[in-house]
Amino acid sequence: MAVNYETKATNTGGRNGHVQTDDKAIDVAIVPPAQADAEKGTNPEQLFAAGYASCFNGAFDLILKQNKVRGAEPEVTLTVRLEDDPEAESPKLSVSIDAKVKNVLSQEEAEKYLQDAHEFCPYSKATRGNIEVDLNVAVVD
């Protein structure tokens, strides 16, 4: 299988440490979720939310363009939750994907294209069957 892209990140210190990508595009302090703020650092959940939101919106935009939908201007907000797992000793993740598109298409079309994006998105593929994912889309003015 051909590799289209590869990147590396190295962490020291776990959730009280530091992470840096090999190209230094990301070079940040890592702190536990309760301590995260712009001055102290970020956490793995924020990084996951940022990556998944960006990847998913790219997939959604591509699906819209493939279906000749113009002017939809998709926006995706991804919420990552770190929650107790009653079946395990460690916590688990769940996510909500909340998308908005301009009213150049119907709610039914927006939901179909959102689902198509979920099938296409590499992050969605990687998490499928592993975490709960809620999909929501709103058609706005």
UniProtKB/Swiss-Prot annotation:
Any one biological process term the GO annotation gives: response to oxidative stress
InterPro entries tied to this protein: KH_dom-like_a/b, OHR, OsmC/Ohr_fam, OsmC/Ohrsf
Domain of life assignment: Bacteria
Signal peptide: none
Segments for region (Disordered): 1-20
TM segment ranges: none
NCBIfam families: organ_hyd_perox (TIGR03561)
PANTHER family found in the cross-reference section: ORGANIC HYDROPEROXIDE RESISTANCE PROTEIN-LIKE
Membership in a protein family: Belongs to the OsmC/Ohr family.
Protein name, per record: Organic hydroperoxide resistance protein-like 1
